[in-house]
From Swiss-Prot:
Pathway: Isoprenoid biosynthesis; isopentenyl diphosphate biosynthesis via mevalonate pathway. The active site is at S62 (proton acceptor). NCBIfam families: PRK03955.1. GO terms for biological process: isopentenyl diphosphate biosynthetic process, mevalonate pathway. Its EC number is 4.2.1.182. Belongs to the AcnX type II small subunit family. Heterodimer composed of a large subunit (PMDh-L) and a small subunit (PMDh-S). Keywords: Isoprene biosynthesis, Lyase. This is Phosphomevalonate dehydratase small subunit. InterPro entries: PMDh-S-like (IPR012016), PMDh-S-like_dom (IPR002840), PMDh_S (IPR020794).
Length: 134
């Protein structure tokens, strides 16, 4: 199944999905040294996003979150791609400067952690390749 949204940052990535149903703050909510979600209010606290596809409704918090996304990419601890329902400035700028493919306008209620997906940032598409746990 393909979901159509809008591509913000070009690039194609394929991998395991980690889905949060809550907005995510990268500043203080993600450890850039480990790629682990540290926000105690997050429904994916303790999950490692390194090398995975990260999906969540939208970002929240400080604009410094953009630089945390950049730091994740530079340290090799970031996600392969990001999928959001609403790409606000924090996440969009972070993905742009980090070069992480970003697709917005996707209904994340159709996605679940453990799915294998392919993200195409140029076409604005998310393709579900495999359901369930990998």
């Amino acid at each position: 199944m393909k979901l159509k949204g809008r591509g913000i940052v070009k690039g194609v990535a394929e991998g395991e999905l980690v889905v949060s149903r809550k907005p995510l703050s990268f500043l203080g909510g993600v450890d850039p040294n480990t790629g682990i979600i540290t926000d105690p209010e997050s429904d994916i606290q303790g999950e490692k996003i390194t090398g995975k596809i990260l999906a969540f409704p939208r970002g929240k918090g400080s604009t410094v979150g953009s630089y945390v996304i950049y730091a994740l990419a530079k340290k090799g601890t970031g996600p392969k791609a990001i999928i959001v329902e609403e790409a606000e400035a924090i996440v969009a700028v972070g993905a742009i400067i980090a070069g992480i493919p970003l697709v917005t306008g996707i209904d994340i209620s159709k996605l679940k952690s453990g799915m294998k997906v392919r993200v195409d940032g140029e076409r604005g598409e998310v393709e579900i390749i495999a359901q369930g746990d990998l």
